[in-house]
Amino acid sequence: MTNILIVEDEQNLARFLELELTHDNYSVDIEYEGQAGLDKALSNNYDLIILDLMLPNINGLEICRRVRQEQSTPIIIITAKSDTYDKVTGLDYGADDYIVKPFEIEELFARIRAVLRRQPQKDIIDINGIKIDVDAFNVTINGEQLDFTKTEYDLLYLLATNRNRVLQREQILDHVWGYDSEVETNVVDVYIRYLRNKLKPYGKDKTIETVRGVGYVIR
């Protein structure tokens, strides 16, 4: 599912956009202030940001500039500022498109589709709602990034890429810790527990199954 962040201080408009987008099978988060929007944009892995320019705390141009310093997430500016100078400035700050209010929802949807088509397809592994971004080396659930160590990520990636195949502890140890590692096989059980503890708040801890006497598998 495509994850969209809306940063818009007009609450009625923001909620209307959320309703229309979710009806069209997009996942939507809303922030009504600039700082909160910037924080959310930088701490999550969104597919698209819809951004107003005139916001409390931090204006949309500054958010656009800051996001573009760290991410390539596409940004569509929606604003009442219709001067050519404002449009050029917004695009020069890193926005991918610029729409002047008021606008028709059909036009916004068409522009969203066009912007998303221009983005390279991400290499994403989706296991029961657990999304592993192979390019970014991160894991998200419902758009929220989980705090994984490299070893935890490598372990989850190994299980996910061998879905429905039971992996023995020795196999896991060799792939994740290396063939020359002197680590005991019980460390695999410890790290499986770490993974389950981090997945549990999202109801995903049972995604990793124990095959008694053998090892582990993701179905």
Curated annotation (Swiss-Prot):
| Recorded GO CC terms | cytosol; protein-DNA complex
Q: Does the keyword ATP-binding apply?
A: no
Keyword annotations: Cytoplasm, DNA-binding, Phosphoprotein, Transcription, Transcription regulation, Two-component regulatory system
Q: Which residues carry this modification: 4-aspartylphosphate?
A: D52
Entry-linked InterPro entries: CheY-like_superfamily, OmpR/PhoB-type_DNA-bd, Sig_transdc_resp-reg_C-effctor, Sig_transdc_resp-reg_receiver, WalR-like, WH-like_DNA-bd_sf
Annotated DNA-binding residue span(s): 122-219
Q: Where in the cell is it found?
A: Cytoplasm
What's the PTM story here? Phosphorylated by ArlS.
The residues covered by the Response regulatory domain are 3-116
Q: One matching Pfam family, short form?
A: Response_reg
What GO annotations for molecular function exist for this entry? phosphorelay response regulator activity; transcription cis-regulatory region binding
Any one GO BP annotation for this protein:
regulation of DNA-templated transcription
What's its job?
Member of the two-component regulatory system ArlS/ArlR.
Q: What is this protein called?
A: Response regulator ArlR
> Which species is this record about?
Staphylococcus haemolyticus (strain JCSC1435)
